[in-house]
Amino acid sequence: MLSGVCARLASALRGTRAPPSAVALRCLHASSSRPSADKRDRTEKPPRAFDQALLEFLVCPLSKKPLRYEASTNELINEELGIAYPIIDGIPNMIPQAARMTHQNKKQEEVEQH
């Protein structure tokens, strides 16, 4: 059973890797002089999107419950605890201290509506 899960995880991760040429270019780029901010902004690729296939394997580190992906805010949401983990460049930041509370926002909206 565990080997099947590991195989599916490995398969999902293989699909998210950058091509070797991009990695090689980054290494060469890092060893050369640093470009100006204007040039770097024009040549950088847009941030990578989150691969939703990983939701099968990711759980909240606090409750061990499945998470829901919210594309509009680019976060992984734990409805039960009312927290949202940010996703930066396609990588979820699952550190509990980095999560934001979502229940407080809902309570404030309810108070403002009444």
Swiss-Prot record:
Name of the protein described by the UniProt record: Protein preY, mitochondrial
Encoding gene per record: PREY
Any Pfam family: Trm112p
Segment annotated as transit peptide: 1-35
HAMAP family in UniProt: UPF0434
Similarity comment: family membership: Belongs to the PREY family.
Keywords for the protein's UniProt record, in alphabetical order: Mitochondrion, Transit peptide
Domain TRM112: 51-97
Lineage: Eukaryota, Metazoa, Chordata, Craniata, Vertebrata
Main localization category: mitochondrion
Organism of this sequence: Bos taurus (Bovine)
Note in the entry: PIGY is derived from the same bicistronic transcript that encodes these 2 different proteins.
Domain of life: Eukaryota
Subcellular location: Mitochondrion
GO-annotated cellular components: mitochondrion
